[in-house]
């Protein structure tokens, strides 16, 4: 809120504050602006309402002042008058149609303001004009909430008498009684209870009114609620009872009352903390703790993380409370889940008095805690020298390591407190002792840039060139973390060797470069020229081995964007085109990451721009284009020689323009085109940048290419144009732009690819309805061209009913009976894939249900052979397909269903057959459906066939009955025939005897190598729909040599 000086305000405002109506009238007569607004948008009427001056208010309104003007906080004059409890001013404003429902920025109405300010008379004037007294503000609070919070009993009575909802809750589910209890307004609480308020209600966190009163120490409310019988041990959402809350807030009077009433002093919350834990930790919990301990609280109870109340006193430094707990029988060396005792905790947080108390009480200073550390480890690590001194005085071996081999001196060196370090050194700590990682205290001091500790350790004789398990010296760590170079400089002055390489082949120069520490690099370079250092370090003169890393400091600085470090490196390192294991140069990495300053530094020093890596054969220009770093790209192109560098190709023939379009980097696309990039350049698959834009759908890139003359009908190695690809991928915006471009040059967009497919085929196959609609608007697509496997075939085979419907609507119903090169109609395709909705659509357009393809198969046969039960049911029931038709091998639909073992389909067909001749119809191999069903073990079908009069004596071309057809091979069938002949003593003239011996006599050869198999006519034909069509195999177009667009045409189905 802005406080303005009255003397700086207009005369009218000054007159209002002076309370002089005559002067106000005179100023208005002189045309003073009655609607003037200050910088808080307050008007003179706001001022008069604030002062409650009814006469001036009316005078201003009659002179044209806006009665509902809002200031910057959306407060109206009525809000101001109510806040000032001026009944007369409110009456005048209401008389002049002030808005009683006006809301400020907190959504508070004048009634909210009245309730909060005890303006009972004002509220009485407002309430009759309101339709609802339960309107809530932004926090969800009603006027009753505000009245209860402010303790205004008369206002509460008024609101309740006018229909206020006593149990209304705000956005935290708190009711009026919560706020009254929290503020200690006992009379309001009683009033609310007498009107039916729930005393056990809970907010969103399950706090009850008792929790609220206990937290703020309102003892009178607490006693009243307890007298009403509320549960004093009721937990909130965190498991805290009112006793927990009172202890946490140090409300000892409430704690005493709750304990006297029988509250459970040992009840745990969700984390296992008791009230005693809270009392031990809280700022004002000392008296609470005394009360709890005196009333039987368990001083050794542990939380879920193993902490006792003594741990809590140690954590927060509650010295006197720790003494009380210890005197009450607390276990001194109890451990939490990390193994830390209270002494560890006190040492970690530097509570010296607590440490003294704990040691005096017998705490074990040599007890191990987290990671096997002593309390002295933690005190040294945190830099508390007085605590270290106390712990040392208890006496134990200071060189004893923790679980990782680190001594207290390691901890002090890492913590950086010189006093702690010197204390340990003077006590005899071993400064060369190494941990399990091979690191000495000097390694830790260097890694944490603790110059004073490093100085003291080196001065004590610590070895500066000791290697850890990774082969790193303290200098490596200093190079990593030392921004101002002090530690590194001191190590160099004390004979640290900057040429030592770790096990990965990195020396201090690498680490300084990786972290961008320019000063460190300058210091190292001042000792030894970097080129000499890089050449000589890492080699073994005796073994002729070389452990130098393939990544140079130049690579590291360039990759991480440390251009200042790079400037130092390029002054000394001559080979700027050094390559890593994949052949990438520092310039390549800088361009790839978009570090313009690094690119600039390297180019200015003569780094090669057109050098290619080993893997993808890409240059830095490709790297910048791939990731969309336009500034780097401009720098590289502008400094590249020759000029055709803009079209340089990688190993797959891709240009920077192609890569920019592929990744949607419009800025880079324009930069390359403006530099003369060949817009129609092709890669090794014959694809241009426009092909990539069509696949990825980057419309802005496509527009840029078309503006620069890109040809939209160029074909790739599979004959596909960008129009094909955009239609296949469903990018309607790109497709529209390409069609418009084709039209503008009088080109035919309905070209076909190598398999005869047009863009319409592809759009239909993938179900991109918006693309189908757009293509059908073009005149050239109003007739079916290309592969006989038509767009309608493509749509129905993938269940794209919407696309199919569009095609029929646009091209006419005659297309539903179009056939492909094998004579199959769209109905065959729908039947093959069991797409019932498409099947219904085709049948509704008079598709010929009994049309046969080149092998004589009808859609029903196709569905039966492939077990498409939904299609079979529709065709035999709704479409009345002809069940008597036979294919070229004389198989009926029933033969085909049985031959492939599709029992449900066979039963559906059988349900519609009543003609015994059809039941016993034979195919070219003289097999009846019973032969085929029995051979495939279709029990229910066999049973149904027999029930419908199927002949059990019918013989096929091998002379076998259906029973013999069940045999797995010829020999078994012959044996079975012999057994049957023996079992049935009939005359030689019996048909069965003749049949059986005919079957036996057909095979006089006893060779067991001849097996009984299904006849060729029942085998899977080469023309079956094993793979109906693979036109849509291409879901993504990634431009690599192993991810080509899939071959597909109707020959594969």
UniProtKB/Swiss-Prot annotation:
Keywords of this entry: ANK repeat, Cell projection, Cytoplasm, Nucleus, Phosphoprotein, Repeat, Ubl conjugation
- Per-repeat ranges for ANK: 40-69, 73-102, 106-135, 139-168, 172-201, 205-234, 238-267, 271-301, 305-334, 338-367, 371-400, 404-433, 437-466, 470-500, 504-534, 549-578, 582-611, 616-645, 652-681, 685-714, 718-747, 755-786, 788-817, 822-851, 855-885, 889-918, 925-954
Using the record's annotations, give every residue carrying the modification Phosphoserine. 1007, 1011
User: What superkingdom heads the lineage?
Assistant: Eukaryota
Q: Which InterPro entries match?
A: Ankyrin_rpt (IPR002110), Ankyrin_rpt-contain_sf (IPR036770)
Keyword Methyltransferase among record annotations: no
Per its UniProt record, what PROSITE patterns does this chain match? ANK_REP_REGION (PS50297), ANK_REPEAT (PS50088)
Where is this protein found?
Nucleus, Nucleoplasm; Cytoplasm, Cytosol; Cell projection, Lamellipodium
Question: What GO cellular component is one of the record's annotations?
Answer: nucleoplasm
What tissues has this protein been observed in?
Widely expressed (at protein level).
Phosphoprotein in keyword set: yes
PTMs per UniProt: Ubiquitinated by the ECS(RAB40C) complex leading to its degradation and decreased PP6 activity.
Q: What is its quaternary makeup?
A: Protein phosphatase 6 (PP6) holoenzyme is proposed to be a heterotrimeric complex formed by the catalytic subunit, a SAPS domain-containing subunit (PP6R) and an ankyrin repeat-domain containing regulatory subunit (ARS). Interacts with PPP1C and HNRPK. Interacts with PPP6C, PPP6R1 and PPP6R3.
- What is the recorded function of this protein according to its Swiss-Prot or TrEMBL entry? Putative regulatory subunit of protein phosphatase 6 (PP6) that may be involved in the recognition of phosphoprotein substrates. Involved in the PP6-mediated dephosphorylation of NFKBIE opposing its degradation in response to TNF-alpha. Selectively inhibits the phosphatase activity of PPP1C. Targets PPP1C to modulate HNRPK phosphorylation. Involved in the PP6-mediated dephosphorylation of MOB1 and induced focal adhesion assembly during cell migration.
Q: Know the name of this protein?
A: Serine/threonine-protein phosphatase 6 regulatory ankyrin repeat subunit A
Q: Which organism is it from?
A: Mus musculus (Mouse)
What is the phylogenetic placement of the source species in the record? Eukaryota, Metazoa, Chordata, Craniata, Vertebrata
Its gene name is Ankrd28
């Amino acid at each position: 809120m802005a406080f303005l000086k009255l003397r700086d305000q207009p005369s009218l405002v000054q007159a209002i504050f002076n309370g002089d109506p005559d002067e106000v009238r005179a100023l208005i007569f002189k045309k003073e602006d009655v609607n003037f607004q200050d910088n808080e948008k307050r008007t003179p009427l706001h001022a008069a309402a604030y002062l409650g001056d009814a006469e001036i208010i009316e005078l201003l309104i009659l002179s044209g002042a806006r009665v509902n003007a809002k200031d910057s906080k959306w407060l109206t004059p009525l809000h101001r008058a109510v806040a000032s409890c001026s009944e007369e001013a409110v009456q005048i404003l209401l008389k002049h149609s002030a808005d009683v429902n006006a809301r400020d920025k907190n959504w508070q109405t004048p009634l909210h303001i009245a309730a909060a300010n005890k303006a009972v008379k004002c509220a009485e004037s407002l309430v009759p004009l309101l339709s609802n007294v339960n309107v809530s503000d932004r926090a969800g609070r009603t006027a009753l909430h505000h009245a209860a919070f402010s303790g205004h009993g008369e206002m509460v009575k008024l609101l309740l008498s006018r229909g206020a909802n006593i149990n209304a809750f705000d956005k935290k589910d708190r009711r009026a009684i919560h706020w009254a209890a929290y503020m200690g307004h006992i009379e309001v609480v009683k009033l609310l209870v007498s009107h039916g308020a729930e005393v056990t209600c809970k907010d969103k966190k399950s706090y009850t009114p008792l929790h609220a009163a206990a937290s703020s120490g309102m003892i009178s409310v607490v006693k009243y609620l307890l007298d009403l019988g509320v549960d004093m041990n009721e937990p909130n959402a965190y498991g805290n009872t009112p006793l927990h809350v009172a202890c946490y807030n140090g409300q000892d009077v409430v704690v005493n009352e709750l304990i006297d009433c029988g509250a459970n002093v040992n009840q745990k919350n969700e984390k296992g903390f008791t009230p005693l834990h809270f009392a031990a930790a809280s700022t004002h919990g000392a008296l609470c703790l005394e009360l709890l301990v005196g009333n039987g609280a368990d001083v050794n109870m542990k939380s879920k993380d193993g902490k006792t109340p003594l741990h809590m006193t140690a954590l927060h430094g509650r010295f006197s409370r720790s003494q009380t707990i210890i005197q009450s029988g607390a276990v001194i060396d109890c451990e939490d889940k990390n193994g830390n005792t209270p002494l560890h905790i006190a040492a970690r947080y530097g509570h010296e008095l607590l440490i003294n108390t704990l040691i005096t009480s017998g705490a074990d200073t040599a007890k191990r805690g987290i990671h096997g550390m002593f309390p002295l480890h933690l005190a040294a690590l945190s830099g508390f020298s007085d605590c270290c001194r106390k712990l040392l005085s208890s006496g134990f071996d200071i060189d004893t390591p923790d679980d990782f081999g680190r001594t207290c001196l390691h901890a002090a060196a890492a913590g950086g407190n010189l006093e702690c370090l010197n204390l340990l050194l003077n006590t005899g700590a071993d400064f060369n002792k190494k941990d399990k990682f091979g690191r000495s205290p000097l390694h830790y001091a260097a890694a944490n840039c603790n110059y004073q500790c490093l100085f003291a350790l080196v001065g004590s004789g610590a070895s500066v060139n000791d290697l850890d398990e990774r082969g790193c010296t303290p200098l490596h760590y200093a190079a990593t973390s030392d921004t101002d170079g002090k530690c590194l400089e001191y190590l160099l002055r004390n004979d640290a060797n900057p040429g030592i390489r770790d096990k990965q082949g990195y020396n201090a120069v690498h680490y300084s470069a990786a972290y961008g520490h320019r000063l460190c690099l300058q210091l190292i370079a001042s000792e030894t020229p970097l080129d000499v250092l890089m050449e000589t370090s890492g080699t073994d003169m005796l073994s002729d081995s070389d452990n130098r890393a393939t990544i140079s400091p130049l690579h590291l600085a360039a990759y991480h964007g440390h251009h200042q470090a790079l400037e130092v490196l390029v002054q000394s390192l001559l080979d700027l085109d050094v390559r890593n294991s994949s052949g990438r140069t520092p310039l390549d990495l800088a361009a790839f990451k978009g570090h313009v300053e690094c690119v600039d530094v390297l180019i200015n020093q003569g780094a090669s721009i057109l050098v290619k890596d080993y893997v993808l054969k890409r240059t830095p220009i490709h790297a910048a284009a791939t990731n969309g770093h336009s500034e780097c790209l401009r720098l590289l192109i502008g400094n590249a020689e020759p000029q055709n560098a803009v079209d340089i190709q990688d190993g797959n023939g891709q240009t920077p323009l192609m890569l920019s379009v592929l990744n949607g980097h419009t800025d880079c696309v324009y930069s390359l085109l403006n530099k003369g990039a060949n817009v129609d350049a092709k890669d090794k698959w014959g694809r241009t940048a426009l092909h990539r834009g069509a696949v990825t759908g980057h419309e802005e890139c496509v527009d840029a290419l078309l503006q620069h003359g890109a040809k939209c009908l160029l074909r790739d190695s599979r004959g596909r144009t960008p129009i094909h690809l955009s239609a296949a991928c469903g990018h309607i915006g790109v497709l529209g732009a390409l069609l418009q471009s084709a039209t503008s040059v009088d080109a035919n967009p309905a070209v076909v690819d190598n398999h005869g497919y047009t863009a319409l085929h592809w759009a239909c196959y993938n179900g991109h309805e918006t693309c189908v609609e757009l293509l059908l608007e073009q005149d050239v697509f109003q007739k079916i061209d290309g592969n006989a496997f038509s767009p309608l075939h493509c749509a129905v085979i993938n269940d794209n009913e919407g696309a199919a419907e569009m095609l029929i609507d646009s091209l006419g119903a005659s297309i539903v009976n179009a056939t492909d090169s094998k004579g199959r109609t769209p109905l065959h395709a729908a039947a093959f894939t069991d797409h019932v909705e498409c099947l219904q659509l085709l049948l509704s357009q008079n598709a010929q249900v009994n049309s046969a393809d080149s092998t004589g198969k009808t859609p029903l046969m196709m569905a039966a052979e492939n077990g498409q039960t939904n299609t079979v049911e529709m065709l035999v029931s709704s479409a009345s397909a002809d069940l008597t038709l036979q294919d070229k091998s004389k198989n009926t639909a029933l033969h085909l269903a049985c031959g492939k073992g599709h029992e449900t389909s066979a039963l559906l067909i059988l349900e519609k057959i009543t003609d015994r001749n059809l039941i016993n119809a034979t195919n070219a191999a003289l097999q009846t459906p019973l032969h085929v069903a029995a051979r495939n073990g279709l029990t229910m079908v066999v049973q149904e066939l027999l029930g419908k009069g199927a002949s059990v004596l019918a013989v096929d071309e091998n002379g076998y009955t259906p029973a013999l057809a069940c045999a797995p091979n010829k020999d078994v069938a012959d044996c079975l025939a012999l057994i049957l002949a023996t079992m049935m003593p009939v005359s030689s003239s019996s048909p069965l005897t003749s049949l059986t011996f005919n079957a036996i006599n057909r095979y006089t050869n006893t060779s067991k190598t001849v097996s009984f198999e299904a006849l060729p006519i029942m085998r899977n034909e080469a023309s079956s729909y094993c793979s109906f069509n693979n036109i849509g195999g291409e879901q993504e177009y990634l431009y690599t040599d192993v991810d080509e667009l899939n071959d597909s045409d109707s020959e594969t189905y």
